[in-house]
A protein has these predicted regions:
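Bacterial N-terminal signal peptides that target proteins for export
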Residues: 1-8
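A structural "domain/chain start" motif
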Residues: 23-283, 287-372
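Bacterial N-terminal signal peptides
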Residues: 8-16
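Sec/Tat signal peptide C-region and signal peptidase I cleavage site
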Residues: 18-22
């Protein structure tokens, strides 16, 4: 079920942080999946909370049938770890407060924390906050990993979902490593332990996850092959460009509130390289990117560095090989441009908090309605 809510984001931002600038009004689209069974177990426990702060984007662009590529790398600077950790702690407290204010029966974390199954989920060495993760940005071609820091509240470390329930954008190696680590330790998969914990306590487990993006990376590559009758040879001309833009936003789909209801089996869904996380039996998701624009940034993205590498027997961007078109196959150019987006830390943090608070309010409204 999908529901669209019209809201002036500018108003939400201004209420939360009066010094924040105006932003275009936009709609918040929330998608609800399989949460009706919450009525059976309306008592809830928030056992996971995380904010994924993306800070390095890589986008590789190619043209069909070409050996040439253009790669854009964009780095976020200006936001400190202590500032994001403090924001994460405040936002976690905000969600707990909203759940209680909505009339939901919320199990105190201390009641669940003492359960051996909860300790099993978090592991012998719980994830630190922040922990670094890598992912594929915007279906970038090649094995180019973008990076993010995953923050969790003080005292509530994030636990990585089972590999088959994790978002497809995360590297297969990372997901396999987490699963193998549990298997070698004699532990059950995370999904099985969550199910057992929910069933043993007769409660619905909740996990909140927010994906904070800071910009876009892009580029293009084009090739033109022609025959020079004067020199009697074929020539290939390669044109490549990369670009970057600043934009602070909550990404859709993987920004979610996941529910694990006792005895409920997740709906079977076909998974592909675009599949979102499916770490629960039901979900309340952000179904459309929620953007606050580029006012958090200090100026435009800066081009920090650029490199170009020839692929094949080539000496320049305009490549010539005697012997016809067949002779220039496999000849190309690989270029990389690096950009830096510098944030005003206070504006960045204030805006992230306003965005997440707005979405948390919508998530809690749907959850409370389903529990009645």
């Amino acid at each position: 079920m999908k529901r669209r809510i019209g809201i002036g984001l500018a108003a939400a931002l201004l209420v939360t942080c009066p010094t924040t600038w105006a932003t275009e009004a936009q709609s918040i689209e929330i998608k609800v999946e399989d949460i009706a069974s919450l009525k059976k177990y309306p008592k809830v426990a928030l056992i996971g909370y995380a904010i994924e702060q993306q800070n390095f984007l890589v986008k590789m662009s190619t043209s069909w049938g070409s050996t040439s590529s253009s790669t854009s790398e964009v780095t976020l600077e200006g936001v400190s770890t202590p500032a994001m950790q403090a924001a994460t702690d405040r936002l976690y407290a905000d969600l707990v407060k909203r759940l209680e204010a909505a009339g939901l029966e919320v199990v105190k974390l201390d009641e669940v924390r003492n359960d051996p199954m909860f300790a099993d989920l978090k592991g012998d060495k719980p994830q630190p906050s922040p922990s670094e993760t890598s992912f594929v940005f915007d279906k970038s071609k090649g094995f180019k990993n973008s990076k993010a820091l995953v923050f969790s509240p003080s005292g509530l470390p994030w636990h990585i979902p089972s590999a088959h329930e994790e978002a497809a954008r995360f590297g297969a190696g990372d997901k396999m490593s987490a699963n193998l680590s549990r298997a070698f330790s004699g532990k059950q998969p995370v999904a099985d332990v969550e199910n057992a914990l929910a069933k043993a306590r007769g409660i619905t487990l909740l996990k909140a996850y927010y994906v904070v993006g800071f910009g876009r990376a892009g580029g293009r590559v084009s090739e033109m092959t022609s025959f020079n009758y004067v020199s009697n040879r074929s020539e290939k001309t390669i044109s490549a460009a990369a670009n970057a833009t600043a934009e602070l936003y909550l990404d859709k789909t993987d920004t979610r509130l996941a529910l694990r209801v006792p005895g409920e089996t997740p709906t079977l869904r076909m998974r592909n390289n675009s599949s979102p996380a499916a770490d629960g039996s039901g979900f309340i998701r952000l179904d459309k990117k929620l953007s606050a624009g580029a006012d958090f940034a200090v100026g435009e993205p800066k081009n920090a560095n650029s490199t170009e590498t020839q692929v094949g027997n080539a000496l320049s961007t305009t490549l010539a090989v005697v012997g016809g078109l067949a002779g220039i196959r496999g000849v190309g150019s690989a270029s990389t441009q690096e950009f830096v987006v510098t944030a005003n830390e206070q504006r960045y943090v204030d805006t992230v908090e306003a965005l997440i608070q707005t979405v948390q309010a919508e998530f809690v409204d749907r959850l409370a309605a389903a529990a009645k």
